[in-house]
């Protein structure tokens, strides 16, 4: 079972209560089917959580958990694909899974990070970039979307927001936005038509400039709203 929290594209963060319920469901299904079920927890946005909260770890609630992490988000190094898979020590066959994980990158050679970047990351394991800029950007963008009449859930983390498009065809909606220098991702790419994803992992100044473009887009293309 693969989970992604904090979630791309919605920005949702699963609560401890949700993860406990998931863990109980997995325990029940393991007994029902008579074999182990593993959770692969995709956690590249772990530090990007808003309102002073911290994201819970599913491995605290479920033994058979593999946690996948990437430094590309916490250190603002999106071009450097470097991270790790943490095997819960209480996981079934943990002694076999650890060496298996270490062999994966060797088998897919182009995913191997350079020695230089590995040494660099080792020196900053407990450091992060300034994560507060994402919350500032999110609040600016969310408030403007609500002001313009979009239906949108306020993100709890990541640097994405996932509003409902102003027409059923999200692809057409995003294509219209291009005329206003707004690059949006239609939700069809995520198997959920009718929405679009916006990213705000940029300078706050650029987010502010985009708000005017967003308003022009909506008022010009959808004047009856």
What feature does the model see in each segment?
Residues 1-225:
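PLP-dependent class I/II
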